[in-house]
Curated annotation (Swiss-Prot):
This is Ribonuclease Y. Its EC number is 3.1.-.-. It is found in: Cell membrane. GO terms for cellular component: plasma membrane. It comes from Heliobacterium modesticaldum (strain ATCC 51547 / Ice1). The lineage of its organism: Bacteria, Bacillati, Bacillota, Clostridia, Eubacteriales. Residues 325-418 form the HD domain. One of its GO terms (biological process) is mRNA catabolic process. SUPFAM superfamilies: Eukaryotic type KH-domain (KH-domain type I), HD-domain/PDEase-like. It is an enzyme of class 3 (hydrolase).
Length: 509
């Protein structure tokens, strides 16, 4: 029984436990449903909030887009309005221009009509005038045209001649300027000595007793020396000196060397004098050859005949107007070579011809003829080229220069001779030449004063303005030049300057 009761109690407890657990489970389920409903409600609320936020954001974006669109529309409207105003302005400007063009066309048409009327009137008047001119002149229109063309042709020829003269003058000025530049450059690059030659030589003596020994018993020593050398010995009161006088520099040099050797040796008698003169002659011959070789070395000339070299050396003791001829020849060679190089000519040929241009002066006192013809003969004899021979022949105008080298040699010769200090004259002949120069200028009518300046290389003539006009001044200058060339002998050239001055003087009171 107890077991039944216990079983019942167990069943009841089991059933009760089941119901209890069921009630607990139902309570939990209800609580979960509540939470689920709460979660759903929260989610719904959150979604609603987000929806509202999204709606607000969308509304803001739409609002901003609307504002931006309105701004762009305003800008476009403003741009369109500005373009419309510009178009209106252009249309107004075009309208004004069209009106102006129409007015101008009207004016042009009116003027064309007037011009056409004038042209027609002028043609009619011209026909009448031509007919009247033909009647008065007795010439037809064709004859008048021929006469007019002839006059025009003369005028054109005159204008062409004036133009040609102007061009020639410009060309001459340019050529003279270029020539001056070339000559100046050549002179600057060529160093030359001034004249220092003389017709006497002085031999110093150790004492005055030597003068008696030189004279010798009854003058036999001095006579022997003078006879052998052809030089005058001047023994005067000059202390401790003997003067050798002679116009042949080579003989004077032989006498000087022989006398110096005799003085140094101390034995002075005719036999010894003959011996010393012979030695001096050999020494001078050696020096002549050395001087010629030195000249060819200085000028860079090679291949000269030995006899021509000796003749060049003889020029060392030859002078012209006091100018040493060998130094002059070397200077001419340098100048001609420099100018030839500047002009694109043959500088070697110019230097060779310049060095040999005065070779005839070495023996012109021994042979007949002037130094030009003698130089030509010598150049032919010693096989110089035709170009060199032509330069020698043309340097003083004996032949017309046919080559540029011949012209340059003649120009270099004139420059070397005419430069200040190159040549000199005796004082007496110099003064006479200046006086004669001024006398020639004073002899012309209208000349007020004449002054020879620049050592006689220029004369300035003052003329009276009331008697000599500008054109007459040119004639006076040419006439004076002709008189100088025909009546005077002078080295180089003389510049003639005629000055005509007009002064107007008044006084303010």
């Amino acid at each position: 029984m107890e077991w039944i009761i216990a079983g019942l109690l167990a069943v009841i407890a089991f059933v009760g436990g089941i119901f209890y657990r069921k009630s607990i489970a139902e309570g939990k389920i209800g609580s979960a449903e509540d939470r689920a409903r709460q979660i759903v409600d929260d989610a719904v609320k959150e979604a609603e909030a987000k929806r509202r936020e999204a709606v607000l954001a969308a509304k803001d974006e739409v609002h901003q887009m609307r504002i931006e669109a309105e701004r762009e529309n305003r800008e476009r409207r403003n741009e369109l309005q500005r373009l419309e105003r510009r178009l209106l302005q252009k249309e107004e400007s075009l309208d004004r221009k069209m009106e102006s063009m129409e007015r101008k066309e009207d004016n042009l048409q009116r003027r064309e009509d007037e011009i056409e009327k004038l042209r027609a009137g002028l043609a009619e008047t011209l026909q009448k005038q031509v007919a009247e001119l033909e009647r008065l002149s007795g010439l037809t229109s064709e004859e008048a045209r021929t006469l007019l063309l002839s006059n025009i042709e003369d005028e054109v020829k005159h204008e062409a001649a004036m133009m040609i003269k102007t061009i020639e003058n410009q060309a001459k000025e340019e050529a003279e300027k270029r020539a001056r530049e070339i000559i100046s450059l050549a002179i600057q690059r060529c160093a030359a000595d001034h004249v220092a030659e003389s017709t006497v030589s002085v031999v110093a003596l150790p004492n005055d007793e030597m003068k008696g020994r030189i004279i010798g018993r009854e003058g036999r020593n001095i006579r022997t020396l003078e006879t052998l050398t052809g030089i005058d010995l001047i023994i005067d009161d000059t202390p401790e000196a003997v003067i050798l006088s002679g116009f042949d520099p080579i003989r004077r040099e032989v006498a000087r060397i022989a006398l110096e050797k005799l003085i140094l040796d101390g034995r002075i008698h005719p036999a010894r004098i003959e011996e010393m003169v012979e030695k001096a002659q050999k020494e001078v011959e050696t020096r002549i050859r050395e001087e010629g070789e030195q000249a060819t070395f200085e000028t860079g000339i090679h291949g000269l005949h030995p006899e021509l070299i000796k003749l060049l050396g003889r020029l060392r003791w030859r002078t012209s107007y006091g100018q040493n001829v060998l130094k002059h020849s070397i200077e001419v060679a340098h100048l001609a070579g420099l100018m030839a190089a500047e002009l694109g000519a043959d500088p070697i040929l110019a230097r060779r011809a310049g060095l040999l241009h005065d070779i005839g002066k070495a023996v012109d006192h021994e042979m007949e003829g002037n130094h030009v013809s003698i130089g030509i003969d010598l150049a032919k004899k010693y096989r110089e080229s035709r170009e060199v021979i032509h330069c020698i022949a043309a340097h003083h105008g004996d032949e017309e220069p046919r080559t540029i080298e011949a012209v340059l040699v003649a120009a270099a010769d004139a420059v070397s001779a005419a430069r200040p200090g190159a040549r000199r004259e005796t004082l007496e002949s110099y003064i006479k030449r200046l006086q004669k120069l001024e006398e020639i200028a004073d002899s012309f009518e209208g000349v007020e004063k004449a002054f020879a300046i620049q050592a006689g290389r220029e004369i300035r003539i003052m003329v009276k303005p009331d008697k000599v006009d500008d054109a007459e001044s040119l004639r006076v200058a040419r006439e004076i030049v002709k008189r100088i060339e025909s009546e005077l002998e002078y080295p180089g050239q003389i510049k003639v300057v005629v000055i005509r001055e007009t002064r107007a003087v008044d006084y303010a009171k």
